[in-house]
Amino acid sequence: MRVLILHTDDPKIEKSVAALQRAMEQSGTKVDLKSPKASGSAPISAAPYSLVCVVTEYTGWWKPQIAADMDNLLKRTTRLEGKRGGAFVQAGMLGSAKALRVLMSHMERQGVIVEDFGTLGGEREIAAIAQRLSRLT
């Protein structure tokens, strides 16, 4: 099975995504990573993937928003309709639940069926998320 992980260019996010990729590849899943800088302005096709995950940071705690480059990356990704998905935000003190709802609404507007969601914290939590995602593929 193949998994596409769309993530922002934040160093903390990249570290968490690399740990998630390692954990998922140990279970035999092929994982491809895409970020706004690496993908340029070309459209990204989600057709060959069985699962699409989005990992991003957010700003604000009263009315959190996801990064603008992540929103543009989601809009440039094609063939998302009907795909299974996972939505994840970096763990924070306040607003992570609201930020997660905002991210899921952006994904659902593109047609993704969000089946798993959460906040990324430490290594143990990332390993547990990788196991859950492996069951979805």
Stretches with model-predicted labels:
Residues 3-36, 44-137:
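FMN-binding flavodoxin-like domain, especially the glycine-rich phosphate-binding loop
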